[in-house]
Structure formats: structure tokens, C-alpha cells
Amino acid sequence: MTQRGEVPDFLHGCGLPAAWAGLPQWRILETGFGFGLNFLATWAAWRADPHRPVLLHFVATEAQPVSAADLLRAGSARPGLAPLAQELSRQWWGLLPGLHRLRFDDGHVLLTLCLGDWQAQLRQQRQQLTVDSVYLHDLPQDWRPQRHPAPAGLPGLPGLKAVAACCRRGTRLASRCSTVRDALVQCGFTLHPAPGSDAQRDMLHAVYQPHWQPRTMRPAAAPATPGECMVIGGGIAGAATAASLARRGWQLRVLDQAAAPAAGASGLPAGIFAPHVSADDNLLSRLSRSGVRSTLEQARWRLREGLDWSHCGVLEHRADASPGLPARWSDGPGADGRQSAAHAALGALAQSGLPANASVCWHPQAGWIRPARLVAALLAQPGIRWQGACRVARLRRVQAPGAGPTAWQALDAQGRVLAQAPTVVIAAGAGSLELLEHRWPLQPVRGQVSWGLHGDPAAPLLPFPVNGHGHLVPRFPLGDDAQGPCAWVMGATFERGVEQMPPAPADVQAAHASHWARLQTLLPRMAPPLESAFAAARADAGLAASARAAQSWAAVRCTAPDRLPIVGPVDAAALPGLWVCSAMGARGLTLALLCGELLAARLQGEPLPIEHRLAKALDSGRM
């Protein structure tokens, strides 16, 4: 695979960087990512431009991604691109067929990779994907669309039609592919030949200006202008939504009934983020992989590794011996190197003390997080204002005088206005039910965990979490000293329809007993070190807990009937400006950051961070 042409020709052929000056965002489509040189050059130009757009979307197709080593080698050979190539190669993992969103420069440069059958993916995405520039990968000089199919990953006439469907009137295209002149004209492009650096072929410049009205044409509207927005809920879902919108220039006010953020389910002492795996690679598996990538990116940017989080991997113990990874996954950049992952799993299995024949799956791109630290870091971004100790009892829609826009008011129990904004996002977990006036069948789910202090901070403990039948984080620091007091946490119960807080003493004891039983199956090696803590909790039942006893922590989460998050407008026609990002259930650390990005993308009409069918599965319309 080669990257043809001089990189600047594509950039300048689309009138960049001048064309994007002063705009809130710019969207580029490239057919054939190759070694990523066009992306790297565009990224470098964006960085160097003081008038750059706030967001740079770069959507690229590729039939088969190259290795990270090849990517780095090609980028490092170009002056000025080596540092960017290194950043790109660090995120070059888990690239299975499908759509992947990679983020750079604090989320202001967004690379969306469409891998595999990219024409089908473009057709799926076209309702949300409208691009301003196209880098058309070139084809063999003797290729003729009437005689030969396009080589794998390169556009023939059907592919060019898929590209055209993603364009607006005025979208500019650059290519060295002189053999597609007629096909481009058929698809609605007006050609403007320009000399290229290759003496044998000219650089093609084209503008999408069809003389007909395509059935798939969408209004060439500017992206939604960032404005004011209220987010109701100060947990991980609300913080993720606020952070995603703030990066796009919105002014956010986050309201919560608690005085401090993360007072509900996001106040968990420590939790894990890890992908869900299934033999058929189902919807939740694909969704969780995208979610893990989003969580990893934010944790790297905003948290202190070893104190607030750890990218240590997670060992999944499948006690029921159910199948794990799909058999069709192969070694390479797609599956993160199945052979190397298998070796890592053997090493983790040996450390865990599980039997050699135990059914396990090693997740290298996973770890533990202290959720409250992540929430605080997200809410600390510019443009976000915290408004705590105010319980929103209901929402009221008000119409501005004359032709002014509709606004939403957040009211307390006495009917006093707490805040007002044209856009509001409900992200209040179990509290979303009341604000949505119980219009959807959301269900509260109480979760309890057992946790406690380690008596000896230097004691040798498993360096990574284990999940499966429950989950255990064997060790995490309680304060800001990695060598100071450390704790463990085991959980969690899933008590559907239970809202009572705090739990009754009998419920606490039942949860401790459940966690102790699960621990002996999940990770027998950790049972002896923690046995005294669980025994002390039983002995202290009904009394003040001793320092050595396992402690209880509980909160109420929220789930939808299908146990998937809900992201989208409540009722776009009847209730404009009212959105929801809720029902994370027990997967908030894995999915909330992704859901915040999905909501922001939908609100602003951007390219989606996940496949259209996954976004549809999360859409509020299913309620």
C-alpha cells in the first residue's frame, strides 16, 4: 500500500487552510487512509493556523489498516510530521472492521476511521455526515470504471456516488485520479483541472455543484452555533456531556441536588472500565470497545496515573466457561495482536492464581478509575459552571417575546427558577425519571459494593482488577500518595426496582455475603487476605463498623429495559431543545464519555463517533 502524491497538493487543492478560517468546525473525507500522511499534514496545518476552526473532523476510509510500525515509519520520514505520527501510532490499536473515533489535541482534532466495507458505512452515515472537503485517493492510471471494478478500498462509480452523497453544494475535492473525470461529472462535480507536481498527471480540482436536486441532499446549514445549555446531573453522564459541549464552545451550567459533584452512583470508591466481549461480537461488545477508547483518552489527558486511575489491564474470569472473543478475529492491528494478547493472558492467569484451565480473557486496554476524580476533572474545563445544592423538581418551557427562541427553565419544588437556557440535557441518573415525567419505562437499580483498607500497604497484591462474576479492584490509593493508605473494592449488587437509601442493615449484610461468595469463585487467591474483613463485617452487624471490617457503599443507578444508555432528544418536534443522556446502568465508566460525545455530535450535526446502527440503538426514539 502506498500513499500517492505530494501531501500538500490535497490540502491546497481543497483551498485549505484558508477555507476553514474562523469557522466553528471543518469536515474532511479521505478515501484511502494509507499511511495517514494526508491526515498528518492536515493536522499540522490546523495546528499552525491561528484562524483554525475549533473542531477539525477528518473522516477516512480504509480497506485494511497498516501496522502501527509502518504508520510511524512513513510519518517520521516527513519533516515536521514525526511527533504527530507518534501520537497517531499510540492510538493505533483495536482497529477491527467498523467505525473508530480517535481524538487528538484535547478532543479538537477528531479522526474517524471507516474500516472494511467503507462504502456501506458511508451510506449508513450519510444522514449525519456532510463534508466540506474530499481527498480522493488515486487509482491505477489504466483503470476505467466501465471495464474494471475499483481495487479494494478505492472508489469506483458506486463509491463515488457514496462520496457525493456525503457532500454539500460547494464541497471541494482534490485528486490525482484523472481516470475518474467522467464518473465525477456523473456524480454532480464540476471539474477544475490544475497542474500537479507529478509531470505525468494533473491534479484534479472539483466542486460539488449538481444541476439536479439529489434525493439524499441535506440542507447546507451551518453547524449549530454553540450557546447556553443546562445539564441536570453532576455525575459521570452529566460531566461527560458538559465537557463534550464545552470543548465545542458552549457555555454550560451543571445543576445537581448535592453540594458537590459525583454524590450519587459516580461516588463509587473505585470502578473498572473494560470492554464487553461476546462470541458473536454483539452490539454491546462493539459499543463498549468505542466507550473504552473514549474513557482512556480522557483519563490520559485529565487524571494522574497511579493515583486517580491505572491503565493496568483487566483480567476477565469467565467462570461459566462461556466463549469469549469471536473466532474470526485475527492477529494484527485489528485485534490488538491476538497472539500477544494470548501471551499476556497467560501471564495474568499465572499471577491471579487461577487454575491453568480457567477460562479467561485479558483486556490490555482497560483498568480502574476513581470516578469522582474523573467527574471533577471533566467539570473543571473552561465554560462549565457548577451549581450545586439545588434540586430541580421540574422543567418548564417558555417562549421568548416575539419570534425569540424557546427556552427551558429549571424549577425547584416551590416553583422558583434555578436556571434557564435554550438547551437542556437531563443526565440525572435515577432522578431522570421524575424530570421526564415518567414518560419512559426507566428502572432504578440499587448497587452495593464492599470495600476496605489494606492493613499493609506494601503487601504483594494482584496489580490489576478481575471481573466476570462480579468485579474486584485489589488495590487503589485512597488519597494523593501512591505509597499511602490503599483500599480494595468488590461488587456490585444489581437490585432492580430498589431505591431505598441508605440500605437497611439486613440488606448491607446480604450484600457483603453475596460479595464474599462471589469473590471465592472470581478470584480464590484473594479470599484469604480479605476473609477477616468480611468476617468482621458480619461480627459488627448492627454495630459501629470496626476499622478492619469491610465497609458498605451504595447508590441508585438507572437502566432502560434493554440495559443500553439513552442518548438523544426527548421529543424533537414537540419539545425542541430538551435532550437526555442517561441510563448508563453499571457501565458508566465504560460508556458515559462516549455518550457525551455522541450527544454533542448529534446536537451539532457532526459526524457520529460510532456506527449509525449503534447510535440508533441508543437513540431516545426507541423509548
From Swiss-Prot:
GO CC entries: cytoplasm
Reactions that this protein is recorded to catalyse: 5-aminomethyl-2-thiouridine(34) in tRNA + S-adenosyl-L-methionine = 5-methylaminomethyl-2-thiouridine(34) in tRNA + S-adenosyl-L-homocysteine + H(+)
Region (tRNA (mnm(5)s(2)U34)-methyltransferase), start-end ranges: 1-209
A GO term, aspect molecular function: oxidoreductase activity, acting on the CH-NH group of donors
Pfam families for the chain: DAO (PF01266), Methyltransf_30 (PF05430)
Intracellular or extracellular location(s): Cytoplasm
Co-factor(s): FAD
Protein name (database record): tRNA 5-methylaminomethyl-2-thiouridine biosynthesis bifunctional protein MnmC
Role of this protein: Catalyzes the last two steps in the biosynthesis of 5-methylaminomethyl-2-thiouridine (mnm(5)s(2)U) at the wobble position (U34) in tRNA. Catalyzes the FAD-dependent demodification of cmnm(5)s(2)U34 to nm(5)s(2)U34, followed by the transfer of a methyl group from S-adenosyl-L-methionine to nm(5)s(2)U34, to form mnm(5)s(2)U34.
Region FAD-dependent cmnm(5)s(2)U34 oxidoreductase, annotated ranges: 232-623
